[in-house]
Amino acid sequence: MSKKTYMLDTNICSFIMRERPDAVLGKLEQAVTNQHRIVVSAITYSEMRFGAANPKASPKVAAMVNAFVERLDAILPWDAAAVDQTTQIRTTLARLGTPIGNNDAAIAGHALAAGCVLVTNNTREFARVPGIDLEDWTQ
């Protein structure tokens, strides 16, 4: 079995931390057991940190983010390849009249550039991205 790298997007990270759903946790455990890598983009990490820094957020949120991030294999750094893929995605989707949010485009671009399977429970948005390998672990 070839080893995969699963990139979790911000929505699925928030869902996991907030709801702790058995089905998703089971898929995470299975991926780890099969020695697949579990990563997030630096973009997702930034979004989680920003959410935790919100003055209205409970101090527990920062602790949850810290605990979650510690269990990941990596936070992938934003690099030129990710920027180039993101630019391609945004250009293509704008031309088609089906743009997605800037952060979602950046996460999708990063997943494509890094050869990752993007795990999200926001498939409606990401399904517009040509060539992306998506999985929704909530299904």
Where are these regions (language model features)?
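Short, well-structured N-terminal submotif of metal-dependent ribonuclease cores
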Residues: 1-40, 53-67
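Active-site neighborhoods of divalent-metal-dependent phosphate/nucleic-acid chemistry enzymes
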Residues: 2-4, 74-119
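Generic structural signal for small/hydrophobic residues in well-ordered secondary structure
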Residues: 9-10, 48, 86, 111, ...
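Phosphate-coordinating loops and pocket residues in cytosolic domains that bind phosphorylated ligands
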Residues: 18, 50, 128
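Residues at the C-termini of beta-strands that transition into short coil/loop
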Residues: 42, 79, 138
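C-terminal structural segments of small proteins and small subunits
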Residues: 121-125
